[in-house]
Amino acid sequence: MVNTNLVSIKINNIPLQVPEGTRILDACRDNGFHVPYLCYLKDINEIGACRVCVVEVKGIHHLVTSCNNQVQEGMEILTNSPRVREARKINVELLLSQHHTNCPTCVRSSNCELKQVASDLNLTVDRYKNEYPEMIWTSTFPLIRDAGKCIKCMRCVQICDKLQTLNIWDVSGTGSHTTVDVSHNLEIKESDCSLCGQCVTHCPTAALQERDDVEAINGIHGELANDDKVTVAVVAPAVRAAWGEEFGLSPEFATDRRLVSTLKSVGFDYVFDVDFAADLTIMEESNELLARLQQPDKYSWPMFTSCCPGWVSFAKSQYPELLPQLSTAKSPQQMFGAVIKTYFAQKKGIAPENITCVSIMPCMSKKRELTLPGMDSAGTGQDIDYVLTTREICRLIKADHIDVSRLPECDFDDPLGEATGAGVIFGASGGVLEAALRTAYHTVTGENPEIGEQSPLKVLRQIGSFKELEIDIKGVKLHCAALSSLGEARRLIQAMKRGECHYDFVEVMACPGGCINGGGQPIRPSFQNKPKDCADRDQCLRGYDARSAIRFSHENKAVQTLYDDYLEAPLSDRAHHLLHVEEY
């Protein structure tokens, strides 16, 4: 409920009225008064650790941290007094004295919050000796931590605890040796980390980042430089909603088709749309759901989606008893890799081992997924050879000095380039469930359901990132849910275990908002106060769906051809071998 009680305050001698209970920081920024900060995350991390947000309050002798103190009636606040500016400078200088300032070679050099605050404060001289900690960290794990860049803001600790409920990070050491490390003295690879990457996208510096695989693709000995290799790039749905942000381009200009042209300029031989494999996933998953519904007593309910590896990892470590309830369908990434290394290789007369398949994903967990058992369908190694996050592919493009703004649009390649609107909404929370039910409805009734206000899929209630839905298919009502963030997943599972609710079909995405806000997406400071606010990226994908000539996965002609020529039918023996897992 919105607080309608107002208090009268002054900020920099300007009288204002703001809602009672408002934090000083919010009151200042909402009214156009800039107050810097490094640790603050609204409703998640409000601990005043960085001391950069200090302000002066008349009548209080000491400076006040604005992120965790509320306005009071009659309060007079100064945001930029000489005393405030000097305190901020000293605090940031002390942070820099324990920070590895290799800014020119840092992956966050263009969007480092610490660097920006230091620049805004006009810090041009190092007044304190620079000594930063160094800690051993495995270079092969998909998540990399550089202790020398950690400013102890505690964002990673809080986002993992409160949003994802995995408690991977904790404070270790005491006094000047205090730092952040993996909980329980574990190595990161031994922990329950789901690799959702939310700690990375909320880190103000490069203390946390994905393992960089760009050099393996674009280096002097990289895959693109090897003339004996046929290089294939496959692009996830959510990438098109965000890649242009790294180049200052609008979603209307930075389209999926312009990304195809860009990747061809980089040197990829083929560029395919993962939306195609999303349509393939829908064909398998919707038929699997219907098959289970025909034998309801044979299975435990609900059936969960399985295309998010962060969610699958969470289920394996936290609720292994639920694994039989996960769909056996592989993710679109892994389905595509299997199809490329078998069907596509045969069709083009290319030995599978001579194909390098690079998956471009909004996700860090995909870097681990490609190494899991059963992801080598062709018998010649991994189906997917490399995963590059959206951030990595943008760094690769920049390294090649490609002017994206001058490139034309270009279609995805055949025979695996056709996709539908149902495939593209995979990248947004609720999209997998909606796409699957569109096709399940057609399979049962022989008719396509209406889309939009007249859709048989009705939203019963929505609370934050949790949505409860119901669909009537020929008199059979399916009770469904779609949710994002692992904390929401835990709350739903616990509620089901207590017998408070029942569902037939549940979609879970590890990242708030779905893949559009994945751990591999471009980092935007505006997100760091609103971790669930990714409406613009969601609307981008919904727009692609609305404009699509085909909006049902079962109408994808390229998918139909794949079944006719190779897979035979959904859930066939060959489809099971290539497109499903035996166990988790």
Provide a role label for each language-model segment.
Residues 1-23:
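Generic start-of-chain signal for non-secretory N-termini
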Residues 16, 138, 148, 191, ...:
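Residues that cap or flank secondary-structure elements
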Residues 51-195, 201, 208-225, 230:
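Fe-S ferredoxin-like electron-transfer domains
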